């Protein structure tokens, strides 16, 4: 992030994963194509990043899951199980 709190585009895997995690944790919807365009990478690269985050959540926060929502056109973090 820069001083104004905006994400600057960097193209490391860690930067992408942190960017994706931030969007999802804040309740946003992640569009794979837009994210790929933003970072100048392929959708497959973003899919691998999502898979990495899925593994992270499965190990550290099993009540949270990254799901695709076709109505919203992207991926979101489902934490409905954490409400029980």
Protein language model annotation of sequence segments:
Residues 1-84:
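Short, basic/aromatic recognition patches that contact phosphate-bearing ligands
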């Amino acid at each position: 992030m820069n001083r104004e709190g905006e994400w600057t585009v960097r193209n490391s895997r860690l930067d992408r994963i942190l960017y994706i995690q931030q969007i999802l944790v804040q309740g946003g919807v992640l569009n794979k194509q837009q994210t790929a365009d933003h970072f100048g990478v392929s959708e497959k690269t973003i899919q691998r990043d999502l898979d990495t985050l899925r593994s992270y959540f499965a190990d550290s926060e099993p009540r949270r899951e990254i799901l695709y929502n076709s109505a919203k056109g992207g991926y979101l973090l489902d934490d409905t199980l954490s409400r029980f």
